[in-house]
């Protein structure tokens, strides 16, 4: 497969996007830091105004402390060493609000972390690799271009 173990990224969608962005922002050593992150309609924040309630409750309980909310609101954990990101979402996603991705993207830019974001007008949530997603070809082509040319390793 020609995989270079020194150049490994992480990909996650929805709650898996929270897991991926948590690894990208909470790593404890250079060896555990991914080199890039690919996030599809990710849960990012634990802020009650924008989070996915089920993900929040499963991760940090129904009545979490302010410290726990901040710790797992990954847009607040971005720093200059956070790995570069490819983010894709739909503006009509009602399950995981677009603010999750948008605020994370803005945090990446604030810390000069290379990032690209693709927002599709329709698709809702959970489109992944579904053939009936109108923008499937577009987002997979954009991801391939980014992986081949945009990722700085």
Language model regions located:
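Mobile cap/lid helix-loop segments that gate and shape the active-site cleft of serine hydrolases
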Residues: 42-77, 83
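C-terminal catalytic histidine-bearing segment of alpha/beta-hydrolase fold enzymes
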Residues: 102-153
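Conserved alpha/beta-hydrolase "acid-adjacent" motif
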Residues: 94-103
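Residue-level signal for short, function-critical loop segments
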Residues: 14, 43, 91-93, 121
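Hydrophobic anchor at the start of a short beta-strand
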Residues: 8, 85, 115
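Short beta-strand/loop motif that positions the catalytic acidic residue
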Residues: 81, 86-89, 93
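Hydrophobic/aromatic beta-strand patches that form the interior of the parallel beta-sheet core
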Residues: 38-40, 86-88, 118
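Primarily recognizes the serine-hydrolase "nucleophile elbow" in alpha/beta-hydrolase
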Residues: 1-51, 69-70
């Amino acid at each position: 497969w020609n995989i270079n173990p020194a150049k490994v990224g992480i990909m996650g969608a929805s709650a898996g996007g929270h897991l991926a962005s948590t690894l990208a922002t909470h790593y404890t050593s250079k060896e555990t830091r991914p080199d890039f992150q690919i996030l599809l309609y990710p849960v990012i924040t634990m802020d009650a105004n924008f989070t996915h309630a089920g993900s929040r409750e499963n991760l940090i309980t129904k009545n979490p402390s302010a410290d726990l909310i901040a710790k797992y609101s990954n847009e607040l954990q971005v720093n200059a060493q956070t790995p570069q990101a490819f983010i894709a979402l739909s503006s009509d996603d009602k399950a995981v609000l677009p603010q999750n991705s948008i605020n994370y993207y803005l945090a990446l830019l604030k810390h000069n972390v290379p990032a690209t974001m693709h927002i599709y007008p329709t698709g809702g949530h959970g489109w992944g690799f579904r053939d009936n997603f109108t923008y499937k070809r577009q987002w997979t082509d954009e991801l391939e271009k980014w992986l081949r040319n945009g990722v700085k390793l």
